[in-house]
């Protein structure tokens, strides 16, 4: 009974966070839900062997990351899908329609430019900037050294900034 309680607690505590991460990686809510479910099934099967060398949160992100990579290699291969305006995971209210429009345009531009980055750059940016994980957690999840996380994150930010600047310049023309 204790084992079942612990996986239910993990699910309640981390499901939304893992789902958000997978949604940002897949850009498709139903796929993200399926991968999140797979992540927790794998966690359930591996919970007895969890040794505590990392936090539970980092361990779940590692499982989610590998689940995403396996799905991507198997099913996607550069297939891009559109996000429906109604598929968002959170709802925000705005005082003025202009605020909503401005935020939507910026968000869509960011999403489009993020998709243009290499997979490694996407991974490290999403884990750091959107999921707000520490550099150490990212290194553990991706199986990288701390210096590789720092270097890749720096390069990813520069590339994203360059792409965003170029995109803004093209919009002005």
From Swiss-Prot:
MF terms (GO), sorted A to Z: DNA binding; sigma factor activity
Induction entry: By hydrogen peroxide.
GO biological process: one example: regulation of DNA-templated transcription
Keywords, alphabetical: DNA-binding, Sigma factor, Transcription, Transcription regulation
Residue pairs linked by disulfide bridges in the UniProt entry: none
Mitochondrion listed as a keyword: no
Note: The interaction between YlaC and YlaD may be regulated by the redox state of YlaD.
Family as reported in the entry's similarity comment: Belongs to the sigma-70 factor family. ECF subfamily.
Functional description taken from the UniProt entry: Sigma factors are initiation factors that promote the attachment of RNA polymerase to specific initiation sites and are then released. This sigma factor contributes to oxidative stress resistance.
Name this protein carries in UniProt: RNA polymerase sigma factor YlaC
UniProt organism field: Bacillus subtilis (strain 168)
């Amino acid at each position: 009974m204790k084992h079942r309680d612990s996986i239910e607690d993990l699910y309640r505590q981390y499901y939304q966070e893992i789902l958000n991460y997978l949604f940002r990686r897949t850009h498709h809510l139903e796929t993200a839900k399926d991968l999140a479910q797979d992540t927790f099934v794998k966690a359930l099967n591996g919970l007895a062997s969890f040794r505590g060398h990392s936090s539970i949160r980092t361990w779940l992100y590692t499982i989610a990351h590998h689940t995403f990579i396996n799905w991507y290699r198997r099913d996607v291969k550069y297939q891009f899908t559109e996000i429906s305006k109604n598929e968002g995971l959170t709802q925000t209210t705005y005082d003025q329609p202009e605020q909503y429009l401005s935020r939507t345009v910026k968000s869509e531009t960011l999403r489009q430019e993020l998709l243009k980055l290499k997979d490694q750059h996407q991974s490290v940016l999403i884990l750091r900037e959107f999921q707000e994980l520490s550099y150490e957690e990212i290194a553990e999840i991706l199986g990288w050294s701390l210096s590789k996380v720092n270097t890749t994150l720096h390069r990813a930010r520069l590339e994203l900034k360059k792409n965003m600047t170029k995109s803004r310049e093209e919009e002005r023309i």
